């Protein structure tokens, strides 16, 4: 089994029974993010970006599954710390180059979900603004 397939399997199990802001299965949020990013490592991180925060997974367990230190570090960067405010979280996540594209896709998807569900959107807009102003990168060739 490839690392990408294993990441999807882990995320599907970890988020079983969880729902996104619109009431859909949470794994669909992870899949939308993976569909948005470009590289294989970004896709793996996309599937796993919330497994530490929203389930019983740990860094050590992900490492034991054979995910590279770079992937595990990116997942850790995308894991909110206790007492961490939204904007500090965005900045910390974006400081990890592998996590940055995933965080952007995550914020964009959360913004769409919040809009569809009639929920507040300001924190997602502000997070995207921080990425645009403080972490702007030239577009990647396609």
Where are these regions (language model features)?
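Active-site helical microenvironments for divalent-metal-assisted chemistry
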Residues: 1-142
């Amino acid at each position: 089994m490839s690392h990408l397939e294993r990441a999807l399997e882990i995320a599907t199990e970890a988020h079983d029974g969880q729902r996104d802001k619109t009431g859909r299965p949470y794994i669909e949020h992870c899949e939308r993010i993976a569909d948005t990013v470009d590289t294989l490592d970004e896709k793996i991180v996309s599937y796993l970006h919330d497994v530490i925060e929203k389930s019983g997974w740990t860094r050590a367990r992900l490492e034991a599954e054979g995910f590279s230190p770079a992937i595990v570090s990116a997942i850790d960067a995308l894991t909110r710390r206790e007492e961490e405010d939204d904007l500090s979280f965005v900045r910390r996540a974006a400081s990890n180059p592998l996590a940055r594209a995933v965080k952007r896709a995550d914020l964009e998807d959360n913004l769409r979900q919040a809009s569809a569900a009639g929920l507040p959107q300001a924190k997602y807009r502000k997070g995207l603004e921080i990425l645009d102003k403080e972490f702007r990168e030239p577009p990647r060739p396609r």
